[in-house]
């Protein structure tokens, strides 16, 4: 019984560390226009509760708009188009 618990904990921890250490594979074609104006992403700045604060932050750094995106809408994403 102890061996089963130990083996389970070891297996889960190894899978977790492998998931963190694995490089991301991105084989998608990149659009040249998308590369010219990358989005700026920062945590906080009002997200996820005050999207207007995120928008104001993006305007203050010279971007055209801002919105809350990402997991749980916790990242302020600024766009330029």
Curated annotation (Swiss-Prot):
Gene3D superfamilies associated with the record: Knottin, scorpion toxin-like
Coiled coil: none
Disulfide-linked positions: 47-68, 54-76, 58-78
Subcellular location: Secreted
Signal sequence residues: 1-21
Keyword Transcription: no
Reported impact of residue 57 to A: Complete loss of antibacterial activity
Listed result of changing residue 65 to A: Complete loss of antibacterial activity
Any single GO BP term: defense response to bacterium
Keywords from the named record: Antibiotic, Antimicrobial, Cleavage on pair of basic residues, Defensin, Disulfide bond, Secreted, Signal
Prosegment residue ranges: 22-43
SUPFAM superfamilies (alphabetical): Scorpion toxin-like
Keyword Signal (UniProt): yes
GO cellular component terms attached to this protein's record: extracellular region
Record's comment describing the protein's domains: Has the structural arrangement of an alpha-helix connected to a beta-sheet by disulfide bonds (CSalpha/beta).
Entry's family note: Belongs to the invertebrate defensin family.
Described function: Antibacterial peptide with potent activity against both Gram-positive and Gram-negative bacteria. May kill bacteria via an intracellular action mode to affect protein folding. Does not show effects on tested filamentous fungi or on the yeast S.cerevisiae. Does not act by destroying the membrane integrity, which is consistent with its nonamphiphilic architecture. Acts more rapidly than vancomycin, suggesting it does not act by inhibiting cell-wall biosynthesis. Does not cause hemolysis and has no cytotoxic effect on HEK cells.
Other known facts: The Cys-47-Pro-48 bond adopts an unusual cis conformation.
Protein name: Fungal defensin micasin
Species per Swiss-Prot/TrEMBL record: Arthroderma otae
